[in-house]
């Protein structure tokens, strides 16, 4: 008996719609990362992209616990001296709420070409409208 290994051409990837309204940021991000990795499928293979496509709506209505809105900071460096930019989670949620969820999920995926391919299957939108109705995503309750 041989071990089953999924092939990239034969993996069936489904589209799922996730509503982030009222969901905790970290708990939602871990479940999204698991589905992007393909760990919920019986054909999971670590070195093959077996995950599904995920469309997340209402990203601005995600919830965080504790004092993270004021105490958690996102830093980015432009490469120039003295240009370390910082903003709190609360400020980031006001400016670009979809990016907060994207950063949380991206940190839970592998670093490398396979992780980048998995990350490209995540589509996050503010509001309840999205341009993926042609794919007929199934509603996923997390």
Swiss-Prot record:
Gene3D superfamilies xref list: Ribosomal protein L13
Pfam families according to UniProt: Ribosomal_L13
GO cellular component: cytosolic large ribosomal subunit
GO biological process: negative regulation of translation; translation
InterPro entries for this protein: Ribosomal_uL13, Ribosomal_uL13_bac-type, Ribosomal_uL13_CS, Ribosomal_uL13_sf
Keywords: Ribonucleoprotein, Ribosomal protein
PROSITE patterns: RIBOSOMAL_L13 (PS00783)
GO terms assigned for molecular function: mRNA binding; structural constituent of ribosome
Physiological role: This protein is one of the early assembly proteins of the 50S ribosomal subunit, although it is not seen to bind rRNA by itself. It is important during the early stages of 50S assembly.
Subunit structure and binding partners: Part of the 50S ribosomal subunit.
The family this protein is said to belong to: Belongs to the universal ribosomal protein uL13 family.
Name of protein: Large ribosomal subunit protein uL13
Originating species: Xylella fastidiosa (strain Temecula1 / ATCC 700964)
